[in-house]
Amino acid sequence: MPSFDVVSEVDTHELTNAIDQANRELATRFDFKGVDAKFEREGDVINQTAPTEFQLKQMNDILRARLAARGIDVLSLEFGDIETNLAQARQKITVKQGIEQKIAKKIAAALKDAKLKVESQINGDKLRVQGKKRDDLQDAIAVLKAGKFELPLQFNNFRD
């Protein structure tokens, strides 16, 4: 029975490259000359620091541009609150990996509502979709690509 997995993953290597490029751009931009502003990655969290809140917002734009250039969807980021004190402003950005249970149920419901001849089951942080024909699976992918979910979805592990 043909099947595929629906996942939401971020390529950590590309994420590291995008952060490095954003740091290089900060070093060369005129409005950030002589300013202690930087991006740091610790696992699935990106910490950004700058002297002011305004500069943090500019850094967000730089990071979004670099991520888009590297093929990483900005929907996979969750921006935390900006913490300010007299010396600097900080913000934590969390990178979302995997599909949460609540969103997986929404995806499964969307497939059911489309009345396709496929079955879906939730396996941890991914969703397996099975159908009798490959055409049914292609229709399911089209439905999921057209749907609006809070995460970017990727399709992998195709089996015949």
Swiss-Prot record:
What top-level branch of life does the organism fall under? Answer: Bacteria
Q: Which UniProt keywords apply?
A: Nucleotide-binding
**Which GO cellular component terms, listed alphabetically, does the Swiss-Prot or TrEMBL entry include?**
cytosol
For molecular function, the Gene Ontology terms on record are: nucleotide binding
Q: By its UniProt entry, which InterPro entries does this protein fall under?
A: DUF520, UPF0234-like_C, UPF0234_N, YajQ-like_sf
| Family membership noted in the UniProt record | Belongs to the YajQ family.
Role according to the record: Nucleotide-binding protein.
Put simply, this protein is called Nucleotide-binding protein Smal_3487
Species: Stenotrophomonas maltophilia (strain R551-3)
Task: List the taxonomic lineage.
Answer: Bacteria, Pseudomonadati, Pseudomonadota, Gammaproteobacteria, Lysobacterales
